[in-house]
Amino acid sequence: MDKSSKRAIAPFDDYAQGVSESRELRKSNEAIGLRVRKGKLTLLSRKMFNVLMHHAQKLGSPGRNAPVVTEANKKYFWVPLADLARDAAYESNDTKRLKEYLQELKDIRIISEDNVQWTSQSLLSAFTLANPNGLKSRGGQIWVGFAFPPEVEAAVMRPDQYTNLAFVYQNQFRSGASLALYEICRRFLTNPSQLTARLPWTEWFDSVSGNPAGQGYPEYKIAKRDTFKPAIAEVNSVTDINIELIEHKLGRRVSERVVRIDLNLTWGNFYFIRLVRRFR
């Protein structure tokens, strides 16, 4: 892909801290490509969940920075609401709406499944807001306290296998499907074949769309036109990788798909080269 085909990335100074280790997430591979059972994973909810995981990892344990010291508050990870909004690129002063987004994130239930176990769980077990000066006060600072379910917290704080993700890229995306696809492909970047897992296209749709799994699918050609192709184009436009779709057909119908991944080091991304190479 030539340099002109890349969408303009924000000036480096705007994201100078974004490419440092303080703005990176070690995301458990178990938390990449999530399939939703209830609710919907939108772009903002995906970004917000990543930001919450990042701050939990940075804090190291619950209870630190609690604005009001109580036994109950020792169970939460605490971070200023302004920091969450900044890191998730939430460009609004509407605190009420941001609280609604956190509630939506808490209400989402996801499916995790392997060869021996199937689990349905929430991404957040609880969240709370606190301001030492009073929630209705115009002064002071609003803090967000949040807690993960036990299985999620273990994956967040002690991931056995993880993928490094920089916020500088997630905050360039305009759709949740693009962010989800980027995370999946970043996970498989070090695969010697540079191919993702080969899966039925419906499983890809579940993971990328953020819609509840198994609750109806469009025709493949519609899913490809409206979801897969725009997401692939955006990943190739703004990130450090180039990807292409490989379709496997059963007769005349597409049954499975896989994505080929190539590392992109164009001049448009020259200041990310060291960051990317360190993870290879």
Task: Locate predicted features.
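Charged, alpha-helix-forming regions
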Residues: 1-280
